[in-house]
Amino acid sequence: MRLVANTKSAKKRILIIRKRTMRNKAIRSAVKTAIKKFEMALKVKPAEEARELLRQAVRALDKAVTKGVIHKNTASRKKSRLTRKFNSVYKAS
């Protein structure tokens, strides 16, 4: 691995940033996967399964906030929209 930085501290910062970027990508990916699973469940699954997948998506969002990957307001907005989708599909039927 070739580092462009000159000083020892700059090289260390690059390594730290790479490590954090990998961690953040993994967490973001987990959030996106949970949301996609929930949205697929809205179309085909019964309400109980969709509700459980909604819980998992909310949990993934909360974990991402705790780890500082996404802002709490962003997570709140996403949770609100997911809950609204759930209610519109299952309260109507």
Curated annotation (Swiss-Prot):
Disulfide feature: none
Molecular function per GO: small ribosomal subunit rRNA binding; structural constituent of ribosome
InterPro entries in the record: Ribosomal_bS20, Ribosomal_bS20_sf
Alphabetic keyword roster: Ribonucleoprotein, Ribosomal protein, RNA-binding, rRNA-binding
Compositionally biased region (Basic residues): 74-84
Signal peptide start and end residues: none
GO biological process terms, semicolon-separated: translation
GO cellular component: cytosol; small ribosomal subunit
Coiled-coil residue windows: none
Region (Disordered) location: 72-93
Family assignment from sequence similarity: Belongs to the bacterial ribosomal protein bS20 family.
Function (record text): Binds directly to 16S ribosomal RNA.
NCBIfam families: S20
Record-given protein name: Small ribosomal subunit protein bS20
Name of the encoding gene: rpsT
